UniProtKB/Swiss-Prot annotation:
InterPro entries: AlgH-like
Gene Ontology CC entries for this record: cytosol
Tree of life domain: Bacteria
Pfam families (alphabetical): DUF179
Identification of the protein by name: UPF0301 protein KPK_0728
Family: Belongs to the UPF0301 (AlgH) family.
HAMAP family: UPF0301
Gene3D superfamilies in the record: VC0467-like (3.40.1740.10), VC0467-like domains (3.30.70.1300)
Amino acid sequence: MNLQHHFLIAMPALQDPIFRRSVVYICEYNDEGAMGIIINKPLENLQVEGILEKLKIVPEPRNPEIRLDKPVMLGGPLAEDRGFILHTPPSDFSSSIRISDNTVVTTSRDVLETLGTDRQPGNVLVALGYSSWEKGQLEQEILDNAWLTAPADQNILFRTPIADRWREAAKLIGIDIVTMPGVAGHA
């Protein structure tokens, strides 16, 4: 099982305040564990333009058709002061990792400097913090019915309204998660 470029979809019974009703995009999955970014938990009162202002980044030349009022996501409970930018190619920034053919994660300032300009990647999701699991931890949580898994979908990752991402991610595997009971069993 390789969960890289997959969604983790929180089961209804998962009540942890950070992960309740969350969708986590798995950026890295290997023998040492997993790392992902929550894609449906916007930080209150923080938008991309606020991050750029705080870092004193002025988009030049500014393309007024590109919106910078998109919310910044809480990527997870770890390193909440560190930025992670999920985007579509190109991946020629100084600190980019290609996750799939059409998804890249970048942690360097140079990608932020393209936001709001014609050099910006086509699709962008900005998050602060990340989520991580040690070796075997995520697999156990899946066995314990904390998470469903589904192959990642670009539309859900970048274009589906944030409030709909949990429900839409579950639909990828044929589940209406809103009507699902809080506890599931094993067959």
